[in-house]
């Protein structure tokens, strides 16, 4: 596979059909050739780092992930979060081929800003997939429902000429002869 980067970037993993890069997306996306990518899967910061607690492996642990999960020391405002999302989504659009798609995972903490940013940056959301976790962490605060799902937004460039690929028959085959639904468990 030809290297998709205008400037050399070390690859984390590579096969004949794909290249995986690990690093700061703002730096990496600016080094990529325009319209060179068929599909992007993004798992951006959820902005959960708020000095709270969660359960991991049966133990209470901090939800603070690191500085990358916070935009400022005073926390992350809605405006900061949305500006951040628009910035990286705009860079993704530049490198995505005309028929390419982007998949973005998130939780209620960030996914609504991401959906709006996608539309503002000229994307059309194809599907809103709900991933139901089989073993979510318990709700330690006991003040709301247990967070047991994540959302995956699947989108394409909002252009009348844009034609994304979807192998309907393969999905049906993988799902016991039935249409694949937008709620996944795992």
Predicted regions located by residue number:
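Core catalytic lobe of class I
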Residues: 1-186
């Amino acid at each position: 596979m030809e290297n998709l980067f205008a400037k050399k970037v070390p690859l984390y993993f590579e096969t004949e059909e794909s290249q995986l890069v690990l690093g700061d997306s703002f730096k990496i996306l600016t080094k990529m050739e325009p319209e060179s990518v068929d599909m992007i899967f993004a798992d951006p910061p959820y902005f959960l780092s708020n000095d709270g607690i969660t359960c991991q492996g049966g133990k209470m642990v901090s939800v603070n992930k690191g500085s990358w999960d916070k935009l400022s020391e005073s926390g992350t405002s809605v405006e900061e979060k949305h500006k951040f999302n628009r910035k990286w989504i705009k860079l993704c659009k530049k490198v995505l081929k005309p028929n390419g798609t982007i998949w973005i995972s998130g939780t209620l903490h960030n996914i609504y800003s991401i959906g709006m940013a996608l539309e503002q940056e000229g994307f059309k959301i194809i599907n809103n997939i709900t991933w139901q976790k089989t073993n979510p962490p318990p709700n330690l605060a006991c003040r709301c429902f247990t967070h047991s799902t994540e959302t995956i937004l699947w989108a394409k460039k909002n252009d009348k000429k844009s034609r994304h690929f979807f192998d309907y028959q393969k999905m049906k085959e993988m799902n016991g002869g039935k249409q694949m639904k937008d709620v996944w468990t795992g």
